[in-house]
Swiss-Prot record:
Stored SUPFAM superfamilies: LDH C-terminal domain-like (SSF56327), NAD(P)-binding Rossmann-fold domains (SSF51735)
Family matches, as NCBIfam families: MalateDH_bact (TIGR01763), PRK06223.1 (NF004863)
Catalytic activity of the protein: (S)-malate + NAD(+) = oxaloacetate + NADH + H(+)
Family indicated by similarity: Belongs to the LDH/MDH superfamily. MDH type 3 family.
UniProt name for this protein: Malate dehydrogenase
EC number of the protein: 1.1.1.37
Record-level GO BP terms: lactate metabolic process; tricarboxylic acid cycle
Keywords: NAD, Oxidoreductase, Tricarboxylic acid cycle
Gene name per UniProt: mdh
InterPro entries for this protein: L-lactate/malate_DH (IPR001557), Lactate/malate_DH_C (IPR022383), Lactate/malate_DH_N (IPR001236), Lactate_DH/Glyco_Ohase_4_C (IPR015955), Malate_DH_type3 (IPR011275), NAD(P)-bd_dom_sf (IPR036291)
Lineage summary: Bacteria, Pseudomonadati, Pseudomonadota, Alphaproteobacteria, Rickettsiales
Pfam entry (one): Ldh_1_N
Binding annotation for substrate: R84, R90, N122, R153
Length: 314
């Protein structure tokens, strides 16, 4: 009987719990749900196992407060950290979450050095950088969940604008996972037709698309403002699952993620949201898009924002 992949989730809050539920429903692998809060991962694991029986899933879910239980994990998704609250930017979280991430990284290195690691904790581009440097894992094994989520928001808003199914929309969002992200209308399509061409057909306007781009940049903040006590979790979890599945099933899928750049896009030693191909080797390739002067200026501005944050923790 083939052994299930072992998937460890570091952090058992809203995103961690949602991740576990989605992994179980898709039967992607057995789950270890870790948290420092005693009883929380154990209780959620019991609840999730009982929910899984209704769906007919035989996936095993274990709750724990001991990092040793992540030993030998095939994949790890990290959500541990303080969530955003109203009035906070992703960047306000940097000091507290850097300390948390360093501790997580040390334990990942100790117990699961061969795992493929997906970081969700904000501020994303900094946290995934901390994970890489503190763990010493190869950069192709460590990525951040950013562009898949940002693109999903862009997809939704474009589908609403053009009154089509979201399945017809394919969009691209580059840069840091923050207010300076760069949604690219030129590289976004409806059934293969680029947005600029649809504008020329009179189906939308540059003004409307710019409003959608702004709404995409503020997508996470809008949810924080409405929830008041936390941040988005369903969409971030669903986004990470798409990345996880691409790795576990060797799908060689092109997704926009926070990837470690070594000269691509003119960026060195930073994590920034760009299209990559994910398969069983982790990050197989970084895809370099040809940007216009205006797009490159916006991208560079976003990169500078990430650099500035990195400098605050060094």
């Amino acid at each position: 009987m083939k052994k299930n992949p072992k998937i460890s989730l570091i952090g058992s809050g809203n995103i961690g719990g949602t991740l576990a539920h989605l992994i179980s429903l898709r039967e992607l692998g057995d789950i270890v749900l870790f948290d420092v809060a005693e009883g929380v991962p154990q209780g959620k694991a019991l609840d999730l196992m009982q929910a899984s029986t209704i769906a007919g899933s035989d996936i095993k879910i274990t709750g724990t407060n001991d990092y040793k239980d992540i030993e030998g994990s095939d994949a790890i998704i990290i959500t541990a950290g303080l969530p955003r609250k109203p009035g906070m930017s992703r960047d306000d979280l940097i000091s507290i979450n850097t300390g948390i991430m360093k501790n997580v990284a040390e334990n990942v290195k100790k117990y699961a050095p061969d795992a493929f690691v997906i970081v969700i904790t904000n501020p994303l581009d900094v946290m995934v950088y901390v994970m890489l440097k503190a763990s010493g894992l190869p950069h192709n094994q460590v990525i951040g969940m950013a562009g898949v989520l940002d693109s999903s928001r862009f997809n939704l808003f474009l589908a609403e604008e053009f009154k089509v199914s979201v399945s017809n929309v394919n969009s691209t969002v580059l840069g840091g996972h923050g207010d300076a992200m760069v949604p690219l209308a030129r590289y976004s399509t409806i059934s293969g037709i680029p947005i600029p061409d649809l504008i020329k057909m009179g189906l939308s306007s540059n003004e409307n698309i710019e409003k959608i781009i702004d709404r995409t940049r503020n997508g996470g903040g809008d949810i924080v403002a409405l929830l008041k006590t936390g941040s988005a979790y369903y969409a971030p979890a669903a986004s990470a699952i798409e990345m996880l599945e691409a790795y576990l099933k060797d799908k060689r899928q092109m997704l926009t993620c926070a990837a470690y750049l070594q000269g691509e896009y003119g960026v060195h030693d930073l994590y920034v949201g760009v299209p990559i191909i994910i398969g069983k080797e982790g990050v197989i390739k970084v895809v370099e898009l040809q940007l216009t002067k205006e797009e490159k200026t916006l991208f560079d501005k976003s990169v500078e924002g990430v650099k500035t944050l990195i400098e605050t923790i060094q």
